[in-house]
């Protein structure tokens, strides 16, 4: 019995709860229905709104009501017929009012013609949900109030001009798509940042209550038309042009001759910045930067220079058009709208407005000097004419010293002709008499080929003579070979163990009549390979054996007891290469800066030695012991005066020797 009573009470409570929720929902629906009918929309539109849309539109309506009541909106004249219907027809865009947070408080009805989205779908939403992510920072900067930069004027700048990319569901044919398939459309927005102070209200206690001012951004958004959608007759106040990405003219309409005085051929290849007033170049540059980043842009009013002087106020709509794949196929199509006629006619503001200024580089004519071999070294044509025909100079001054008026390349080329062949100067012959008379500039082109031929002949004769001298020296059997000399080792970084006061005098080599052979790559030709008898290999030359000295070697003096000569074993070429484990003996430390190179000695002369009696060479023994000093032949020691002691193989002396030296 008790259980039935508890069950009935629980069901009664649930039934009451359901009835209360049903009544609450019905009341909420009735209130929202009343709100929907109070909104300034048609009944057919408001009847299909959901609860969230009704709340969103109601909040936006309350914001606009406060805004209209706070500002100058309520001061509408009652006289005359209303012009609200004509405003939207006159505008090429739609009106949008944004709050400081970025919510769209109001949009005009014609927004659907430009974006494809209805007015009810956008009002109350945040604009950041419908613009490109890269443009959000720019819009946030436009919504931020800017302080005044002038001390005299306390009012801050309220004007705003920027471009936005908003979502559009319209296709090129005018059909509407789903919001998920929307594309980006560039809108040029211009307007002002307004701050309206609401009217003062009194509190129930009787004290006045103030509210913060209402800030909003009122914009007129205009869609930039694509050049393909324009009708061909643009009218007399507009002309079309095509540019490369660096704003150089590639095409221009013929109507520019009527409005500005230029012919299309004068503009092709020139930059558009050359025909813009200098004070407007910064604003146009910012518009071009917007064009390259967003694809479309509209410039402000700027001054386009006229041909005969003065300027025209112009506004340009630019679009980046791609003709194929890659950035090289892209071009910029500009539609220029003239706002005024030519102002300040006759005032020259740029070089492009002068008759003397040539906009294109002059084309060089074909000259008849193609057969002259020296033309490839000459500078461009204006520089050549300046050297051949200098202004305000007589022919006598040119003939006196023609080298003064020649370019460096021409002077180097004609040096054999102007200077003449090197001859022995006599005391009775003056210098001016030995120099040949230079031809006049007028006769120079005709005699240039002959002079070049003589110069070539002279240089060839000198080269052959030098090569014959070098070959004779190289074939001389008494001349030492450079490849067989000991390598030069600089002693600049070694320590000077001897004091400067005890330095002996350097033995100077007697002057030689025959020159040393040049390097093999000096003339581009290698000297002939000497005979095998002149280039003995290591261990294969019989003259290297101490038991049988060669006939041409100089006699050696008796050795001192402190020195011992190392004998070279006579073996085959392979054994000589394997047994050789030492370097040629080094010379004494550098004495003076003048004594740099050793005298040219052959390898057999440097390594000549005599075997001590009672010692037989061991073929398997190393040639030189690293712990024993390397002795030099007396013939080599005789090259250095006051140097009779034998130097150790190492560069540094022991401590005892160092103490004795000092």
Swiss-Prot record:
Region feature (Disordered): 1-25, 352-379, 417-445, 459-480, 500-595
Residues bearing PTM 4-hydroxyproline: 487
Source domain of life: Eukaryota
Motif (LRRLL): 410-413
Any one GO molecular-function label of the UniProt entry: RNA polymerase II cis-regulatory region sequence-specific DNA binding
GO cellular component labels: chromatin; mitochondrion; nuclear speck
Ranges of compositional bias, category Basic and acidic residues: 572-584
Post-translational modification remark: In normoxia, hydroxylated on Pro-487 in the oxygen-dependent degradation domain (ODD) by PHD. The hydroxylated proline promotes interaction with VHL, initiating rapid ubiquitination and subsequent proteasomal degradation. Ubiquitinated; ubiquitination occurs in a VHL- and oxygen-dependent pathway and subsequently targeted for proteasomal degradation.
Biased composition regions of type Acidic residues, renumbered to the chain: 469-480
Domain PAS per the UniProt entry, residue ranges: 80-150, 225-295
The keyword tRNA processing is annotated on this UniProt entry: no
UniProt induction comment: Up-regulated by hypoxia.
Role, per record: Acts as a transcriptional regulator in adaptive response to low oxygen tension. Attenuates the ability of transcription factor HIF1A, EPAS1 and the HIF1A-ARNT complex to bind to hypoxia-responsive elements (HRE) located within the enhancer/promoter of hypoxia-inducible target genes and hence inhibits HRE-driven transcriptional activation. Functions as an inhibitor of angiogenesis in hypoxic cells of the cornea. Plays a role in the development of the cardiorespiratory system. May also be involved in apoptosis. May act as a tumor suppressor.
Name of this chain's protein: Hypoxia-inducible factor 3-alpha
